[in-house]
Every structure is written in structure tokens, then in C-alpha cells.
Design a protein with these regions (language model features):
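Alpha-helical transmembrane segments and immediately membrane-proximal extracytoplasmic
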Residues: 1-335
Length: 335
């Protein structure tokens, strides 16, 4: 306890630096999942991908990043196991951030796409096992988290298969694929915007003071989705778009439409990634800051400091700009 009282401010500053390091590594490495395919397909260049991803990663981290942070902060280990030794929890969280941040940067330097979530959860579990033991781990919560690592790829594969089959039947296997793509492309745009808005409004905007009911969230999201669909219809019917398509009888026009859809979904994925993975950096930081601010109190709900979320968002954007190119190239063209 004396450690926290005497060196509390220094510990917060050091943890903030380590949190920024972790966010830097996440931005540099994990963003390849969002933009690598767009680069590999030739839709955009690596430089364009970095600029686009920075914008949406930052937006996702700030607007919708607070929800997952609570899980990293107190959903993996039992905070009450450290009630009588809060300094151990503080030092353990700092060690976890340092280890995870260094590993992500090393992996990025080597061009290896790795998971920031796996890294930080493993680090937190490791320090808890060494200091307190297996009783400090919330195994039920952890089982759900680990289960999602297996369920998510399966669900993503199923959804991707359904969308692909749907696209083939509605667009590619028709006699006029370009005409069909112009017809159904705006629908895909609207669905993407609808999902993005639902997640952002319902999960992320509470920390900026916007609390809406389920029906209000649904209505706003549906309205924005319809607007996006209408914009898509108008653009695909415009002379500007027609002039960009050289072969209207073949698949070049279809590729042009799907390149726009791919870019839109990549932006949505970057936003979702920012909202989810920023928690890996700020969760431990939020825990340390709250414990020191409350004089060593570990248990009970805590309010996240206002500066924590923006710090993680900026760190992710900075890491993406400085080191994101190598991993993005691996996913885009190296696999």
C-alpha cells in the first residue's frame, strides 16, 4: 500500500506509457485484419489503406471502445483476490502491458499477424497464476472468451459463404451482371451501415452521454442505412460512375461496384476492430489508474478516467501509421 501512496503518480505515468506501447502494437499489427484484403485485391494502395484505417480505427476506439475494456479490467481475474495487496495487481497489470506490447511490436517487425486479445489475456492470466494462483481466475468468463475465439471464425465463414452464394445467384450468374450489381449493390451498402450504426449507438456512445432506447437506436440506424442505400443508387446510376466503367457488358463494372463495397466493409471492420481491441490496451491501464485514484481500493465499480480512451485511440493510430505497412502487406499479398 505504501508503494501506491508514495509513487502513485509515477506508476500511473509509467502505466500510461506502457498502455500507449500496447496500443501502438495493436495498431501496427492487428489492423492488417481490416485493410489487408483491400490492399491485396488492388482496391486501394497501402498508403491509402493506412489513412483510411487510421480514421476508422480512431473513431471506433473512441466512440465504441469503452464496453470491452471492463472485461479486460476485471472480467478475467477476480479483483477481490487482490484486496489486501492492490500493489501486486497494479504491478501485474503493468507487467502484462509491457510483455504484450513488446511481443506485438516484435511480431509486427517480423511481419507476423498475431492477436492482441490472445496476447493480453495470456499475460494477465500468467501474472495472476504466479502471484495468487488458479483461484484468482474467473474460469467461467474465460471459457466464454476462449470459446468465442473458435465460434467467431466458424460464424464468419458461414456468413461469408451465405453472402458469396447470394452474390453469385443474384449477380454473377445472371446474363447482365453489371445491371444486377447496380441493383443489389446499394442493398449491401445499406446493410453494412445499419450494422455499423447499431453497434456504435447501442454499445459505444454511452460514455459520451448519449443514452437511447432500443427503438430509437433501431430507428436512427435504419434511417442512416436507407440514406446510404439511396446514395448508392444515385451514384451507381450517375454519369460519373458510368464514365468510369469501360466494359459494361462484362465484369469490369461489377468489379468497380464490388471494390466500393469492399472498401466500405473494410472501413466497417476497421471501426469494429478499433472499438474492440483498444480495450486490450486501456483495460489494464484503467484498472491501475482507478486503484491508485481510490487509494488502493480494488473492489467495486469504477469510472474510467476521461483521458484513458483517447490515449489508446491515439496509440493505435500512431502504431498503424509507423509500422502497419509490413503486416498489411503480409495479409494482402503474402498469404
Amino acid at each position: 500500500m505504501e508503494l501506491l501512496q508514495e509513487y502513485g503518480s509515477i506508476l500511473v505515468i509509467v502505466t500510461a506509457v506502457l498502455g500507449f506501447l500496447m496500443a501502438f502494437g495493436i495498431g501496427a499489427n492487428d489492423v492488417s485484419n481490416a485493410m489487408g484484403t483491400s490492399v491485396g485485391s488492388g482496391t486501394i494502395t497501402i498508403k491509402q489503406a493506412i489513412i483510411i484505417a487510421m480514421i476508422f480505427e480512431l473513431a471506433g476506439a473512441y466512440l465504441a471502445g469503452g464496453e470491452v475494456a471492463d472485461t479486460i479490467k476485471s472480467g478475467i481475474i477476480q479483483p477481490d483476490a487482490f484486496t489486501n495487496m492492490p500493489e501486486i495487481l497494479v504491478l501485474g497489470m503493468m507487467s502484462s502491458l509491457c510483455a504484450a506490447g513488446v511481443w506485438l511490436i516484435v511480431a509486427t517487425k517480423m511481419g507476423w499477424p498475431v492477436s492482441g486479445t490472445h496476447t493480453i489475456i495470456g499475460a494477465v492470466i500468467g501474472f495472476a497464476l504466479v502471484t495468487v494462483g488458479a483461484s484468482s481466475i474467473q474460469w467461467g468468463q474465460l471459457t466464454g472468451i476462449v470459446g468465442s475465439w473458435f465460434i467467431t471464425p466458424v460464424l464468419a465463414g458461414i456468413i461469408a459463404f451465405v453472402i458469396f452464394v447470394n452474390s453469385q445467384k443474384l449477380i454473377f450468374n445472371r446474363t447482365e451482371p453489371f445491371k444486377q450489381a447496380k441493383k443489389y449493390g446499394p442493398f449491401y451498402m445499406a446493410v453494412t451501415i445499419f450494422i455499423l450504426c447499431i453497434v456504435t449507438i447501442s454499445k459505444g456512445l454511452k460514455h459520451v452521454g448519449l443514452n437511447l432506447t432500443g427503438w430509437q437506436t433501431f430507428g436512427i440506424s435504419l434511417g442512416l442505412a436507407i440514406i446510404a442505400g439511396v446514395i448508392g443508387v444515385l451514384y451507381f446510376r450517375s454519369q460519373t460512375f458510368e464514365n468510369k466503367v469501360k466494359d459494361k457488358s462484362g465484369f469490369s463494372g461489377v468489379e468497380k461496384i464490388f471494390s466500393i463495397l469492399m472498401l466500405l466493409t473494410a472501413c466497417a471492420m476497421a471501426f469494429a476492430h478499433g472499438s474492440n481491441d483498444v480495450a486490450n490496451a486501456i483495460g489494464p491501464l484503467a484498472a491501475v489508474e482507478a486503484i491508485i485514484r481510490q487509494g488502493g481500493l480494488v473492489e467495486g465499480p469504477t469510472r474510467m478516467a476521461a483521458w484513458v480512451l483517447p490515449l489508446g485511440a491515439v496509440g493505435m493510430g500512431f502504431g498503424l501509421a509507423v509500422m502497419g505497412k509490413s503486416v498489411m502487406a503480409t495479409v494482402g499479398t503474402g498469404i
